């Protein structure tokens, strides 16, 4: 049997994302979400999560995306741009790492601050993942595992989507990035396993990240139904493309993603193919 976690990333980012995650959980197939500790709608998201106890909760470690740190910017300057925010893309962050510009005590301090803020909310956390998957970089992963053990969190996302899975991909640049990050993630799998952590056997949503619609969602679900085992699908739902797009220049199609995971066609396919919907807490 295929078991599927549908995780909505970026909970807390904005009220329009929070509302979409809850809508997708109540009326769609979303089973899990991951929180940005430094997002602008934190208190609202925590309250919503507590009112929906079947929704799995993860920590979404942010080190990129032009987002704000949880720490005072003066305490983590090596992680930030001159504007006091994280670099925009994973390429920018990786350049900083491999040119020796990142202070690792600052990196540990910020990751700990993000973890602590979410843990102090009283939510039961099922797993850790990362914005643009920076949590699996070999220089970041040991800190993430250390924090997971400190807070008794037993699962970490491994975003190693198959390099052969293109699924209506429209951007060669995105495809190259996906292959690189998936390779890094695959190398992280033994480390995560050897530290007694769980993850899914398969991951989907990287090549279509921010651009999932009904057509490519069906391509993903067909792949899920053909592979017995545990799967995670990453999505990014939201309620207002214009509002969110003006604030976050990521090019996401938030509304399309929400509509796809809530559609009757999606529900029917999952029932007909006996795909069991779970969250990370069910892996343990």
Features from the language model and the residues they span:
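Terminal accessory/targeting
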Residues: 2-5, 15-56, 60-127, 139-284
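Active-site histidine-anchored catalytic micro-motif
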Residues: 130-137
């Amino acid at each position: 049997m295929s078991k599927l976690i549908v995780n909505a990333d970026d909970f807390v980012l904005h009220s329009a994302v929070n509302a979409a995650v809850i809508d997708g959980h109540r009326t769609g197939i979303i089973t899990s979400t991951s929180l940005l500790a430094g997002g602008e709608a934190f208190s609202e998201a925590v309250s919503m999560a507590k009112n929906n106890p079947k929704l799995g909760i993860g920590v979404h470690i942010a080190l990129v995306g032009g987002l704000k740190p949880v720490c005072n910017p003066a305490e983590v300057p090596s992680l930030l741009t001159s504007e006091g925010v994280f670099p925009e893309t994973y390429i920018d962050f990786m350049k900083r790492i491999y040119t020796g510009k990142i202070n690792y005590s600052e990196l540990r301090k910020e990751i700990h601050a993000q973890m602590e803020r979410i843990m102090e909310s009283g939510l039961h956390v099922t797993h850790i993942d990362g914005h643009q998957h920076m949590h699996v970089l070999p220089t970041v992963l040991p800190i993430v595992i250390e924090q997971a053990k400190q807070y008794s969190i037993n699962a970490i996302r491994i975003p190693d989507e198959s390099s052969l899975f293109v699924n209506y991909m429209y951007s060669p640049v995105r495809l190259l990035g996906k292959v690189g990050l998936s390779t890094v993630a695959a190398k992280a799998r033994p480390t995560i396993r050897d530290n007694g952590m769980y993850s899914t056997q398969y991951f989907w949503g990287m090549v279509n990240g921010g651009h999932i619609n009904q057509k490519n969602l069906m391509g993903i679900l067909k792949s899920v139904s053909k592979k017995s085992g545990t799967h995670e699908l990453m999505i990014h739902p939201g309620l207002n493309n214009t509002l969110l797009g003006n604030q976050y220049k990521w090019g996401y199609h938030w509304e399309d993603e929400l509509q796809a995971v809530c559609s009757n066609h999606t529900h029917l396919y999952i029932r007909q193919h006996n795909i069991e919907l779970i969250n990370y807490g069910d892996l343990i």
